[in-house]
């Protein structure tokens, strides 16, 4: 038998993403979970809780929009895949996204439960459409702009 040729060295890219401090995750996750548990388990109704639900929804939507905007800015000039992670992801956990979407959902759940309406599916469908649009529209616009600059 002939001796095997030596293998070429393989270089692997170093993980340069920053780690999220543990104390931030230890504060964020129980807080968001508590808000969601309150929204899902409350049986009270009234205008005060509806307003609180709308405020939580607005905070979640704006937090998630900030996360989405930052992600698109970090990936400027690069197309972002719709069903996968972005090519440039400088952090392991994006706390804005980790708080934004659960708060958005919690606000929608609390608003629907506290309104005590006869047709909750109308509100639910509006909130679901808003959530889907909040996720997809900025990515579609970003990818169309990147495609235009690539073809020009």
Tell me what each language-model feature is.
Residues 69-101:
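Loop-to-transmembrane helix junctions at the membrane interface
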Residues 62, 124-152:
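Alpha-helical transmembrane segments and their immediate juxtamembrane interface regions
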Residues 33-37, 56-64, 104-107, 131-139:
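Helical transmembrane-bundle signal
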Residues 34-45, 98-131:
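Alpha-helical transmembrane segments and their membrane-interface junctions
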Residues 19-30, 89-103:
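Select subsegments of transmembrane alpha-helices in polytopic membrane proteins
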Residues 59-78, 142-145:
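Membrane-water interface of transmembrane alpha-helices
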Residues 46-61, 126-130:
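Alpha-helical transmembrane segments
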Residues 1-28, 82, 86, 139-152:
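Cytosolic-side membrane-entry/anchor segment at the start of a transmembrane helix
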């Amino acid at each position: 038998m002939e001796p095997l040729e030596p293998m070429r060295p393989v270089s692997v890219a170093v993980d340069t993403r920053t780690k999220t401090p543990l104390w931030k995750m230890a504060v964020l996750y129980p807080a968001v979970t508590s808000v969601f548990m309150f929204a899902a388990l409350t049986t009270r109704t009234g205008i005060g809780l509806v307003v609180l639900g709308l405020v939580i929804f607005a905070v979640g939507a704006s937090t998630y929009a900030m996360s989405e905007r930052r992600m698109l800015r970090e990936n400027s000039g690069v197309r972002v895949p719709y069903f996968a992670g972005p090519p440039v992801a400088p952090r392991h956990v994006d706390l804005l996204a980790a708080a934004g979407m659960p708060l958005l959902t919690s606000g929608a759940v609390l608003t629907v439960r506290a309104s005590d309406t006869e047709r909750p599916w109308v509100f639910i469908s509006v909130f679901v459409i808003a959530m889907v649009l909040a996720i997809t529209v900025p990515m579609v616009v970003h990818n169309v702009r990147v495609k235009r600059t690539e073809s020009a």
